[in-house]
C-alpha cells in the first residue's frame, strides 16, 4: 500500500446510487505525494453493497490503473575543467546532465534550468536577466539523461558558489494531449506536494476509461484548469546542499613581500627574493592546482626581464579545504 509523506496509507471512497446498470463514478485521492518521486502507483478499487464485496479491480499490471511519478537528478560540470569548478571569465560554459526516471516514452518534455546564488538564494544575472537554459526532448525510454547547456559571463561571480536548479515539464502539445485521450499512458503525471488522482470506474467493474486530475500549485505558474495549460510541471530538482548541482567560482588575492625585509620594499641586488602569498577561496578540496605568477613592470605593464627571461614562478598544491593560502616564490 502506498503511503503519503505523513506515513498514512493512501485510500479513498465514494458512495453511489446508480440510476442504470452501467455507469461511472469518480473516486478522488487527495494526498501529500512529495515522497513519491520516481514511484509508479496503481489504483486498486473494490465495490461493496451493504458491506459485502461485489466487485474488484486490482491488477498491478493494468496500465489503465497506473499513475507514473517522474523523478530527476542532475550533475553540473564546467566544460573546460570537467569538474564543479569554473573561472570568473567572460565565456563560461556549464553542462548540466539531467537524469530522469519514470517518464512516458514518445511524449515531449522540456527541462528548464536557472543558475542560483547559493548565498543569496536568488538567480544570478547577466545584464539584468536571469541566467537560464533549457532543452526539449522526446525520450525513447522511461529512464535516461538529457543535457542542459548554460553559457554566460562569470566575470562578476568570483568567490561565488552557483547552484543549478532544474524543472521538468510535460509539454501539452497536440501530439501529447490528443493522440489518444482514453490512453492512460499519455496522461499527465505530477509529483506535486498536493496530488489528486481521479479514477473513473463503472458499476459493472469496467475500467476502460480512466482519467487523472492534478491540482497544480499556482506557485509553479500552472493554472488549475489543466485543459488550458500548455505545460505541466512534473518534477523538480532544487537543492542548495547538493554538491552535484554546484559550481564553484574561485577567487584569489595576493600579498607580495621581500623575503629578507618582510615588507613591500627590497634591496636592488642580484639575489632578490620575493614571496607572493596567494589567498584563495572557493576551491574544490582534494584537487591539485597550480599557481603561475609573473612579475610585471608597473610603469608600462610589460613583464620584468632578468637574464633575458621573464621573471616567473609557480607552485603546485592540493587544496585540503576550499579556503587557504599558498606561497609563490620569485
Regions inferred by a protein language model and the residue ranges of each:
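Solvent-exposed loop/turn and edge beta-strand elements of beta-rich ligand-binding domains
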Residues: 1-330
Amino acid at each position: 500500500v502506498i503511503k503519503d509523506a505523513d506515513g498514512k496509507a493512501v485510500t479513498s471512497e465514494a458512495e453511489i446510487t446508480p440510476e442504470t446498470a452501467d455507469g461511472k463514478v469518480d473516486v478522488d485521492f487527495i494526498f501529500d505525494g512529495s515522497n513519491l518521486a520516481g514511484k509508479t502507483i496503481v489504483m486498486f478499487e473494490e465495490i461493496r453493497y451493504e458491506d459485502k464485496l461485489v466487485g474488484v479491480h486490482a491488477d498491478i499490471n493494468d496500465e489503465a490503473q497506473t499513475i507514473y511519478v517522474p523523478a530527476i537528478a542532475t550533475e553540473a560540470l564546467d566544460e573546460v575543467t570537467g569538474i564543479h569548478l569554473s573561472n570568473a571569465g567572460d565565456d563560461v560554459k556549464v553542462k548540466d546532465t539531467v537524469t530522469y526516471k519514470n517518464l512516458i516514452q514518445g511524449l515531449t518534455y522540456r527541462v528548464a534550468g536557472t543558475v542560483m546564488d547559493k548565498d543569496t538564494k536568488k538567480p544570478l544575472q547577466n545584464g539584468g536577466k536571469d541566467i537560464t537554459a533549457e532543452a526539449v526532448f522526446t525520450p525513447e525510454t522511461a529512464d535516461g539523461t538529457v543535457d542542459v547547456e548554460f553559457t554566460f559571463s562569470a566575470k562578476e561571480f568570483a568567490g561565488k558558489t552557483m547552484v543549478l536548479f532544474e524543472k521538468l515539464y510535460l509539454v501539452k502539445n497536440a501530439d501529447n494531449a490528443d493522440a489518444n485521450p482514453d490512453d492512460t499512458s499519455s496522461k499527465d503525471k505530477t509529483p506535486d506536494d498536493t496530488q489528486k488522482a481521479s479514477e473513473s470506474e463503472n458499476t459493472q467493474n469496467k475500467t476502460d476509461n480512466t482519467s487523472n486530475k492534478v491540482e497544480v500549485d499556482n506557485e509553479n505558474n500552472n493554472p488549475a484548469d489543466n485543459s488550458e495549460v500548455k505545460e505541466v510541471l512534473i518534477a523538480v530538482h532544487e537543492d542548495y546542499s547538493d554538491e552535484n548541482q554546484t559550481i564553484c567560482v574561485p577567487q584569489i588575492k595576493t600579498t607580495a613581500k621581500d623575503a629578507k625585509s618582510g615588507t613591500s620594499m627590497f634591496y636592488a641586488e642580484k639575489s632578490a627574493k620575493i614571496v607572493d602569498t596567494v589567498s584563495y577561496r572557493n576551491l574544490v578540496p582534494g584537487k591539485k592546482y597550480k599557481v603561475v605568477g609573473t612579475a610585471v613592470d608597473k610603469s608600462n605593464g610589460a613583464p620584468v626581464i632578468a637574464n633575458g627571461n621573464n621573471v616567473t614562478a609557480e607552485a603546485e598544491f592540493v587544496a585540503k579545504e576550499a579556503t587557504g593560502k599558498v606561497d609563490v616564490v620569485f
